[in-house]
């Protein structure tokens, strides 16, 4: 009878169930915690306002300086210059200035408060799948083995483009995407990080950034020109208003005195406006011209600085994204459809789900609820990125099933960090003590692996009975099948992968966070 053997196995499985993180029963005197939104646990270094509707970089000091300069300069112009110009020249001047000011502020806020095109980070399952693919492609590694760089190559309009692997986001970045070190996010069609707008400039806000600097150039030139006009007209008006002949004769004898007499009565605020506009117009107009050149050639600032499509890299190197036409490139950058945001900022975090416990110093223990809740929240904040990569490159390969005995065991993922880097995955075996599995001589060799499997299960804790792997079902013997059966063929790869994934899933999530 094998009942005496089954009882310790069941007892071991029951002991693996951890109840420290089980969901408590609803009681009337305990208030339920309000579910957090996903922006509250966003992994990047960003600031969110208005309950996640506004997304900015963490460094916003220069952005406020931009706001102050625009508001102060425009306010002085509308308060002191526009009344004189409207009464002496035309009322269209303050009207045009007002339209330009509203447009500039609208484009600035739109570029600053928008999602620039942040790419979601890989889920723990995707990160583990990519790690398995990379390890499988690199082959076995020796003590002095140096793995090759993690890149993939795609062909875009006849030009080979490399997709680099991001060790922070655990993804192969799409073409033209880059990781911003300040915001700690991968941004699609990354142009640059602009501190003046307090945000990254990418695919989703580049048009607003360009329209902001272009309209700001017109507004700066407009204010600079009409402030000088106001100063000149006011000086001429006061020079002609000299009433006494004595003053007029004194001024004629001393031309420098005329200038001092006129300028001393000119508003100092007009001079302040002229100075601010004079030093601003050169940088803003130059920046607008540079980005006009980039749009006309369908490049980004990042690509231009690195010289990605420069002819110095070779005669066959060219920009595969350019349409070869100025108008078409401008329409593509400014008039194309705006892609939707790929991150769910205002979604709710679901209640905590059970997570496998980690191993520390050879003993198993359930992690604290606070750490587990934060891990679960960040896991739900990260969305799938496979559809993003499929749009830019070939589909991601699925992990190959591991068949026991058919090849070398799966190695531990050293690049993920955490407990998974030191603990190899368990190798499930056929428990020969279960009835019906001790009739073949070929199965006797599996008893050693059975002991290893039970020893590994004894050091694991599963949070809920649903995640506890059930004992393997009785399998037919080789003698009953009537022909020789290799032990590797008695296992279903799916069941073996499920046992491995159940025991490692929580560890991968901890290491990926």
Curated annotation (Swiss-Prot):
PROSITE patterns with a match to the protein in the record: DHHC (PS50216)
UniProt-listed InterPro entries: Palmitoyltrfase_DHHC, PFA4/ZDH16/20/ERF2-like
Biased composition (Polar residues): 355-369
A cellular component annotation (GO) from this entry: endoplasmic reticulum membrane
Enzyme class: transferase
GO BP terms, alphabetized: peptidyl-L-cysteine S-palmitoylation
Membrane protein topology class: Multi-pass membrane protein
Residues annotated as the enzyme's active site: 194
Source species, domain of life: Eukaryota
GO molecular function: protein-cysteine S-palmitoyltransferase activity
Positions of transmembrane segments: 60-80, 89-109, 208-228, 267-287
Segments for region (Disordered): 348-369
Entry keyword annotation includes Transmembrane helix: yes
Record's catalysed reaction(s): L-cysteinyl-[protein] + hexadecanoyl-CoA = S-hexadecanoyl-L-cysteinyl-[protein] + CoA
Lumenal membrane side: 81-88, 229-266
Positions of the DHHC domain: 164-214
Domain remark text: The DHHC domain is required for palmitoyltransferase activity.
Family label: Belongs to the DHHC palmitoyltransferase family. ERF2/ZDHHC9 subfamily.
Function of the molecule: Palmitoyltransferase that could catalyze the addition of palmitate onto various protein substrates.
Protein name (database record): Palmitoyltransferase ZDHHC14
Organism ancestry: Eukaryota, Metazoa, Chordata, Craniata, Vertebrata
Name of encoding gene: zdhhc14
